Amino acid sequence: YEEGKKHLLWAFWDERGYQRFEEWRMGVLYDTFEYEYYENGQLKEEPSYKNRMKHGKWFRYFPDGEISGVREFSKGVRVGEWVDYYRKDEIAFKGLYNNDKKDGPWIWYYMNRGAVGEQGNVMSEVDFRNGVLISEKCYTREDGEIINCQEIFGENDYRFADQKN
């Protein structure tokens, strides 16, 4: 406290078990962020904020501490390369955001490297321009043959769950 008002960084655990931090300046809440942990104590996500907005790289972790994903934000907006992993640097998907919209190639991979076929372990390649789907290809795991993407993903295609078109 300073002059009877909350001041500087305050840390506490909330009712959900998240570790919260609040930055106060002479009684005015300036910024807040939180950390979520697995039951084993391992950090789930390492957020980064600036002026109360998501900003910078966010790292996500598996319960054993391995990185499960990397996200990037600029002033609360999704930007840059986003990557999720299965395990030990084995990529599940990767793609780019530009001004909160998917932009350029997004690639989803089958688990376990070494799948046969020209496309290796690529499950699908989707090309976006400013958030709009331009083209899409899906591949069979066995021989890399191009197939209808519905055969892999079905009607509830999670690859487009965040689209705001």
Segments the model singles out, each with a brief description of its role:
Residues 1-165:
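Glycine/tyrosine- and acidic-biased, solvent-exposed loop/turn segments at the edges of beta-strands
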